[in-house]
């Protein structure tokens, strides 16, 4: 009686199938990516650091409660209204800027186009935006508020860059990123950033 041989399994074909399954998994699987805002954290101050006295008019308060309602400078406000309110505050130019590092007195903002109200911010380099949320505030709402505030700075920087250098700041910054050795571009980017420094402070969340 003839012996019946057991058929062999084609290992090569199984490897091909496993590879195809892996490719299928990679193509059809989605990965959750956390959204957020890129921020440079402030350095820890020295033990003997004394915080400067800040006038109340130089602080723009944004409060987000647990129901995701916004209270901006004491008034109820919608998210889409924040940008214009922030621009009005930052660009007010109602007084003098910070003194220079060499002790020279601060100067008025000659490029500001605001109302120059004595009850609002003195200068863009003194204008602080304080954002305080509740521990139950939705993160999505917090991000939308931050985005509107960043858009306010972006609009002011673009405007000034167009006036001084005939190019929007976003394009100026991109040009510098492509040519880091260009000192002229570097000075222009720094000039606009110093003129409208992005000062957003996150206050401790309320309970």
Label every model-predicted segment:
Residues 32-207:
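Long, low-hydrophobicity, acidic/polar, solvent-exposed interaction domains
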